[in-house]
């Protein structure tokens, strides 16, 4: 589903929040034009995780993937990366699912400039601690779980910004 979304949107710039083993990143890249860029963010480098990664150095050396290490929920790091984030056609959020980080990220993503056709894809919206989070988003959205990940896939239209309520 991720590759298809990137392809249909013709997403030249993709932001992934939460690299982990790279499965999502590689799925996103599979649907992208060869000239496209993926900026993938995590607090730990892909090669320092301590678990096997699907990523290799070739993905980063001219492969169109750039990993940035830091916490996007923190104001300073978010501001440092604002230009990359504002250029994104698609943002894939596949991060901790602790019920705290996600709300911090919504606060941050609400600061982005409006961009017609920009889509936010949120993974695991059916996890018990993500259900209320998903319900708080009032921007146009679609629960695409039937087409996406078994644990839930949410699509949010960010064309006119992001609206949500805090619990």
PLM feature spans:
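S-adenosylmethionine/decaboxylated-SAM
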Residues: 3-167
